[in-house]
């Protein structure tokens, strides 16, 4: 059995997306245990200050940790890079394998995806992390399947279909 810790905000917990990752793993014959440390609107700087973040990373015995930074507004490359490094450092001597969960641009601002994509790719490359390119896949899927609504009614969060897409990309990455 593999254990996965998800650290993020509403883009992680909407529609219980980590549970979808678990169900995809089960369907593929793999046993997965998932745990979430999430709070709406919070970024990596907030998570670094929470005792449960360090405790889970050091003592939870996780195989993977999926990291999702604040997305709307996206705080930029520097905040992503520094926040990612800070959380990874909390893990101590036996860290899980970290994966960055690249989010998607708001429906009203698809032009923002390029900046997000570059920042996530650069951070993953520089810190030798896995990358779940959900935002890129999201953008391509919308072009190929405009009839399937990936966004929740607020134009920022995921619909159930959007969460399933995110879960599939994350499962494939892990």
Question: Could you describe each region identified by the protein language model?
Answer:
Residues 54-160, 164, 168-173:
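Alpha-helical cap/lid subdomain in secreted, periplasmic
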Residues 2-7, 11-84, 107:
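Conserved SGNH/GDSL esterase-like catalytic core that processes O-acyl groups on lipids
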